[in-house]
Amino acid sequence: MATRIEFHKHGGPEVLQTVEFTPAEPAEHEIQVENKAIGINFIDTYIRSGLYPPPSLPAGLGTEAAGVVSKVGNGVEHIRVGDRVVYAQSTLGAYSSVHNVTADKAAILPDAISFEQAAASFLKGLTVFYLLRKTYEVKPDEPFLFHAAAGGVGLIACQWAKALGAKLIGTVGSAQKAQRALDAGAWQVINYREESIVERVKEITGGKKVRVVYDSVGKDTWEASLDCLQRRGLMVSFGNASGPVTGVNLGILNQKGSLYATRPSLQGYITTREELTEASNELFSLIASGVIKVDVAENQRYALKDARRAHEVLESRATQGSSLLIP
């Protein structure tokens, strides 16, 4: 028997349940992974709450984990039993001690990277890869705005931007988070609880503002993000932490300077095995060399059965960096 987290109705963290189950055999082109560390991501709360509803209920949760391959389905040639792997684009159900995953969605994990490092960074790192390298390729010495700079994605973005020589201006909600972002490589930070984001961006850039804004907050920062952009700048809306952006009048993009806006996703940028290999190789290289550090605080590691508590803390915005479930 194995253990997983399920929910039978949408709602708050209280809907999460721990259940025992018998894992199915891996189908063709699938592998079965004994998870050693499971990534917790904000998108998991959207699925649980019903903002991004699963196809049916009851449903599992989570798409990211790292572990050891225990079984291999027919047609899988590049992964073997015993391989250390990490994945971030599985079907729902990674909040589990055992999970079946499409083989092409898993990457072989280098020995230099632990299961905990991998599960804490893979989805977030792949996200930063497509944001900074594909959606808009930030350039050396180029200032840009990145919201939630002390979150799991944000801290990796701070480190990656520094490695690229770019100047990340990060928004944060406390002095402690400001220091965390600066330590990770942010060029400047803005405490949105105490400062005007727009006025500070203008001040930092000498009135020029920025070419690109990366916004995972959603409705609360939409207008401010647009006001931080230069003429013909790009608004990259990639999350809804404060709720989705709805009812947008496209005319506002004209009014604020012929702006561009995009709503990218990981699946839109990393779909094929070749795309996953390109992204994961770059991420693994940065982690293995110590350029990107993804150590998880002890108080943000939870037993699998404590997923409910992990979600409560995540949604309270009390976390810094990544959180993990340990089966």
From Swiss-Prot:
Catalytic activity annotation: 2 a quinone + NADPH + H(+) = 2 a 1,4-benzosemiquinone + NADP(+)
Its EC number(s): 1.6.5.5
Residues that span the membrane, as ranges: none
SMART domains in the cross-refs: PKS_ER (SM00829)
Subunit structure: Homodimer.
Protein name from the UniProt record: Quinone oxidoreductase
EC category: oxidoreductase
GO molecular function, one term: mRNA 3'-UTR AU-rich region binding
This protein's GO CC annotations: cytosol
Entry-linked PANTHER family: QUINONE OXIDOREDUCTASE PIG3-RELATED, QUINONE OXIDOREDUCTASE-RELATED
Originating species: Salmonella typhimurium (strain LT2 / SGSC1412 / ATCC 700720)
Keyword list, A-Z: NADP, Oxidoreductase
Protein origin, superkingdom: Bacteria
InterPro entries recorded: ADH-like_C (IPR013149), ADH-like_N (IPR013154), GroES-like_sf (IPR011032), NAD(P)-bd_dom_sf (IPR036291), PKS_ER (IPR020843), QOR-like (IPR047618), Quin_OxRdtase/zeta-crystal_CS (IPR002364)
Gene: qor
